[in-house]
Amino acid sequence: MSTTSMQDLLRTLRNRSSIHQDGLEIVDKSIPDVSTPGTLDPRVREVVLTQRPSVSIPEGASPVELARAGMGWDNEDMTTRQISTDVLSIPRPDTTIEARLYRPEAARPLPLVVYFHGGGFFGGTLETVENPCKALADKGNVAVLSVGYRLAPEYPFPTGLEDCHASIDWAVEHADRLGIDPGAIAVAGDSAGGNLATVCCLLDRERPTPYIRYQVLYYPVVNVGEHPNSEYDWTLEAYDRQTEPELLERIILSLQDEEGVLEQWYVQASDSKDPRISPLFATLDDLPEALVITGEFDYLRLEGEAYAKKLARAGVKTRYLQYRGMEHAFLDKLGLYPQAEDSLDEIAKDLKRLFSQTN
């Protein structure tokens, strides 16, 4: 897509409508070049029907290796200035985990966003989210620490969560070295990473003075195991499928089988209704301001909506963005889907407001 075409689509996306409902700001982001309801974004349609990610599958690969190999996408670097990358090691009991720190050339100390990649708790890589993290550092004028937490099934719950939570402590303790402001900490994540981000907020709430001031949850997993609950009932009829209903149904249901995998690989001997696994069942009072982002045709959309509403009812300042025509994991396609870049622009606006930046 040409730069001009992308900029035109981004300008259209910025003209969005919003309503306030029961304390929740709901922002509806229509497809920028399609007006028909219940329609897949044309860029998503092209990817689904004609493109496949290039993957290398080792001979004799296990089910876990096969699942991991199919994740991610070759996205684009959308930065407009130099963003430095430092590869770091965060100490953990008996090991270290890799992290990457992205920083713009700007006056320090900088606010910090700690980012947790998606991948069902068993997959995903720092490489997949590198360009989104760099773009966020550029647009928000912040440092971004992307954390390579340990993955299931080799490391089931709570290892990955503990790695994520410890990475926040480590960043605060090493604020001077990292060039960050320990009083301006945010967390963000996509899918399983959104789960880890908001659960870190739950854990952070127990401190006398919490560190985290803002959370960004891209299409978060908040009800592992799809337990019956009072917040929402999952039904295919909640999705407007006016055009190409069979294709839309296939896209929506593409994650349906993953719930059993999460129980088997991530939860294992734990209880999937534990609020640290399924934060939909947590008490959400006194959590930091939240931005929840979903795609219209994402299997996880309904639980993301429900979580945003529950946050707002608990008194948490919450904004909910729904991108019409989008599939799950659309942030991975930064540079191809204008909605991915627009969502980062929305986050950047919040970061500048919260941390009093004027640039």
Model feature map: region roles:
Residues 2-19, 35-36, 84-100, 104-359:
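Alpha/beta-hydrolase superfamily serine-hydrolase fold, recognizing
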Residues 1-79, 359:
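N-terminal targeting or regulatory segments adjacent to alpha/beta-hydrolase or S9 domains
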